[in-house]
A protein has these predicted regions:
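Active-site mouth loops of central-metabolism enzymes
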Residues: 2-15, 92
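Catalytic domains of carbohydrate-active enzymes, especially glycoside hydrolases
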Residues: 15-37
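Active-site region of glycoside hydrolase catalytic domains
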Residues: 57-180
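Surface-exposed cleft-lining segments at the edges of enzyme active sites
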Residues: 5-8, 45, 140
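Charged helix-capping and loop-helix junction motifs
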Residues: 49-55
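Glycine- and acidic
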Residues: 3, 41-42, 137
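Glycine-rich, proline-tolerant flexible connector loops at the mouths of alpha/beta enzymes
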Residues: 36-48
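N-terminal small/glycine-rich loop or linker at the start of catalytic domains
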Residues: 1-7, 37, 75-85
């Protein structure tokens, strides 16, 4: 795959989340969106990284203490290297692994009004996968079918723990290129 340009620390929410959540609270926000990075909490298949899980526990707890409802994104373009090694979302096996991940975080963070976004901007996710060389443009239909199936799996899994939760996806509107 093509080398990805590192973003480095960006806004450094990771180390400044208490300050950032305090700022959000001071603006009167009642919802705060966060992605739970699968690659951080399950860096090896079936092995949970408890240090990272406790980090997310504290972020969610801090968010709720400040009066905000979490809106959790399960995939914001990043997944573990071992998932990439098996073909990413082009491989149906990934759907089972994704279900395992979603089950873990839905059980842990669901309820109390938690909202869920399964995939951040699926079409942009597809474009990103093409750009870095993980898949080809001609893979669009099978890739999107698998992402759609993964969304359904996540929806059912999250609803198992909280039937009243809001579960969806978000969309980015992009120009469509007809020469795939």
């Amino acid at each position: 795959p093509k080398k990805v340009n590192p973003i480095k620390n960006a806004t450094d929410f990771r180390h400044r989340y208490k300050e950032d959540l305090g700022n959000a609270q001071s603006m009167g926000l009642n919802t705060f969106r966060i992605s739970i990075e699968w690659s951080r909490i399950e860096p090896k298949k079936g092995q949970w990284n408890w240090k990272e899980i406790h980090y997310y526990d504290d972020v969610i707890k801090t968010m709720r203490r400040k009066g905000m409802t979490p809106m959790i994104t399960t995939v914001h373009y990043v997944y573990p290297g071992w998932v990439q090694d098996q073909g990413g979302f082009m491989n149906k096996e990934t759907l089972k692994d994704y279900e395992h991940f979603v089950d873990f975080i839905a059980k842990r963070y669901g309820g109390n009004g938690t909202m869920w976004i399964t995939f951040n901007e699926p079409l942009v996710f597809f474009g990103h996968e093409v750009e870095i060389g993980n898949i080809k443009r001609s893979d669009m239909i099978p890739f999107m079918k698998n992402v759609q199936e993964a969304h359904k799996i996540a929806y059912r899994t999250i609803k198992k723990y909280d039937k009243h939760s809001h579960v969806g996806s978000n969309e980015a509107y992009l120009p469509f290129v007809t020469s795939i």
